[in-house]
Amino acid sequence: MEKSWFNLMFSKGELEYRGELSKAMDSFAPIEKTTISKDRFIYDMDKNFYGWGERSSYYNNVDLLVNSKDIRNFISDDTFFVRDSNKNSYSIYFDIEKKKFEINNDLSDLEIFFYSYCSSSYLNNRSKGDNDLHYDPYIKDTKYNCNNHINSCIDSYFRSHICINSHFLSDSNNSNESYIYNFICSESGSGKIRESKNDKIRTNSNRNNLMSSKDFDITKNYNQLWIQCDNCYGLKYKKVEMNVCEECGHYLKMTSSERIELLIDPGSWNGMDEDMVSADPIKFHSREEPYKKRIASAQKKTGLTDAIQTGTGQLNGIPVALGVMDFQFMGGSMGSVVGDKITRLIEYATNQCLPLILVCSSGGARMQEGSLSLMQMAKISSVLCDYQSSKKLFYISILTSPTTGGVTASLGMLGDIIIAEPYAYIAFAGKRVIEQTLKKAVPEGSQAAESLLRKGLLDAIVPRNPLKGVVSELFQLHAFFPLNKNEIK
């Protein structure tokens, strides 16, 4: 990844902080080993200088001289003086309380102050022969040229340190990467937007167009086209990327409909038992929300009747029986309806001699149905035994993140071939449950797909792009061929 740099000077009364931010700093945790730039310095008004030697190398996550927990007090109402790597200078002002954010090149007052201060203090302590990429003997006024690079750097800084949510629109060529948010979360972290007359953002070039930040709420208005990575917060076009972040490689959750579209040939899907709806068999009582209301809310949110879609279709021309769990429906929990739909699908595949695919994405048994949900584990295991042992048919289990609890203990680990997605979280008991029960820390990554593969619990880890082709080859290897020979891929 190409890294660009800019200098940022904070004017804050007694101290001047000068640091450098990388274009790639998106989170608190380091992406790789960090090497600190060695020409950092703090220079106070009493001429106390703390310095290091020559620069060693770039780094790709934030390393500020200001403690992040004190960042609110530090920048509560301040003007920033910014100089990019092209030695262009800008004035950046924002006020947390008033939700005001402005970038302009009116540097008359700031230039006088900084030029005077730098001439008397900073330049006297730096030799002009130093090989500093960002050394500048003067700070000059320039035309306003706030490019996509500086927007991205400031955006990453704000996003990772002060939880900002609305977007700043750049006039650069790649504007969808230069969103700078215009409001800052409250101290409680709730992120609630506070309306104010200053909830406007000024555009880059001519500063004549004032637009409300609400017009650019991309995740709400265009969520059918774009998806935001919950690891690096980048926006991705979901149809092309298959919900895989190309920046950090993070695998985002997919709905059951998206997985059906990924695996099944267009126009060949036929759903089964779509009218089955969960009841409240044990009259589960909850102070927060009754079980029936939770079911209705999940149905409205997902458009599904329960946490799984089952049916038949063709995979590269090969007839298959497919069941796909949906984590968005009450965490993909397995209740009586989910168990019945899976059981009926397996029985249908047994009678029709179809290969079977079950895609797991679940938190386990549904506690609102008590022991009835636990019964589904035994019921599914029983029909799978008949399908595999008696009929000698072929079952592929695909484990996605997360797959835990009763689903892991039953249908998840009973496949003839067990495939997992990269980085999938797969476990019987969750990390928190183990730590609270055993009073021991669970090693990081011990419940990830890669760790389970090394221990022999999985047969393969397959990314989403080649998944359909891999499954098709496995079916043909086990004598399941396309109805039309021309459809072999």
From Swiss-Prot:
InterPro entries: AcCoA_carboxyl_beta, Acetyl_CoA_COase_Trfase_b_su, ClpP/crotonase-like_dom_sf, COA_CT_N. Residues 225-489 form the CoA carboxyltransferase N-terminal domain. One of its GO terms (biological process) is fatty acid biosynthetic process. It comes from the Eukaryota. Zn(2+) binds at residues 229, 232, 245, 248. It catalyses: N(6)-carboxybiotinyl-L-lysyl-[protein] + acetyl-CoA = N(6)-biotinyl-L-lysyl-[protein] + malonyl-CoA. It is found in: Plastid, Chloroplast stroma. It is an enzyme of class 2 (transferase). The keyword Transferase applies. Its main location: plastid. Binds 1 zinc ion per subunit. Signal peptide: none annotated. Its EC number is 2.1.3.15. One of its GO terms (molecular function) is acetyl-CoA carboxylase activity. Pathway: Lipid metabolism; malonyl-CoA biosynthesis; malonyl-CoA from acetyl-CoA: step 1/1. A zinc finger (C4-type) spans 229-248. One of its GO terms (cellular component) is chloroplast stroma. It holds the Pfam family Carboxyl_trans. Keywords: ATP-binding, Chloroplast, Fatty acid biosynthesis, Fatty acid metabolism, Lipid biosynthesis, Lipid metabolism, Metal-binding, Nucleotide-binding, Plastid, Transferase, Zinc, Zinc-finger. Its cofactor is Zn(2+). Component of the acetyl coenzyme A carboxylase (ACC) complex. Biotin carboxylase (BC) catalyzes the carboxylation of biotin on its carrier protein (BCCP) and then the CO(2) group is transferred by the transcarboxylase to acetyl-CoA to form malonyl-CoA. Belongs to the AccD/PCCB family. Acetyl-CoA carboxylase is a heterohexamer composed of biotin carboxyl carrier protein, biotin carboxylase and 2 subunits each of ACCase subunit alpha and ACCase plastid-coded subunit beta (accD). This is Acetyl-coenzyme A carboxylase carboxyl transferase subunit beta, chloroplastic. It comes from Brassica napus (Rape). The gene is accD.
